[in-house]
């Protein structure tokens, strides 16, 4: 058995060689993605240019002619991301008619965009072995370093991908000291019948981190909620009543209020049709489901970190290559259509 490495190669779908590769492998889309659609390669070139395809290989150094073993692939689509023009003071600039259309010197690839992971397939022999996480992190790293990408989103992920994404996003964010410094403001005293305070957590600091890490708003808030919940002891979460004089219980009560605010905003259309008492009961029910799911994900996260740390101690850092261009040269390092807080009905997904 030879030395094993993994490699990620990328190419633009307007490239004929990439099209030929994709033709051979996208037969797997209807087999592994429920409701998945095979990409139409007869689209105009300007449309194909908005697609990037990442191919994932295992390479085993042996005497065989072809040491590469195909493990999976992913497609990413670029959506134009409109950003309101602002001046140095942060206020919007006045529109000026000092240019004419069309602008021949501007290409779509040079404009700010939302890069959306559309299809993501890992073949069964390589599933549940950490390969999917490594592939996801490689794609994310590439777009995190790409100046044109403003946000990295995912199109209609299934539950398995959701779990992998949550765990890896949490791990990425926890590597930032400024993220680990985010705490619940225990000095807040919510007033009965009043709106939930906006300063339970430092929202400006969170937004700065979110934009830097290019994570879509809803996904980012979920990971923040998960991270903050991890500091709450199990005994506090299981308590029948929260004692406000206990700092951790007070913190947990504020956490619950903050999460409820997001859940209500996210499902406002449905909840607004209910009577107040029914609405409050429904929010409590959904919140308990969220807590249960976060606890499950945090346990999976801790298990994954332990496994990765053990592997590093046992065999050193994993070998692998960065993302390669379709021409064989190293390329420069460089959820959803919309991740806004509202728009997705409550019954659609268990994870909210």
Please place each PLM-identified region on the residue numbering.
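Non-catalytic substrate-recognition and accessory regions of acyl/acetyltransferase enzymes
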Residues: 1-115, 141-352
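Conserved acetyl-CoA binding element of GNAT-fold acetyltransferases
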Residues: 114-124
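Conserved acetyl-CoA-binding loop-helix of GNAT-fold acetyltransferases
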Residues: 122, 128-141
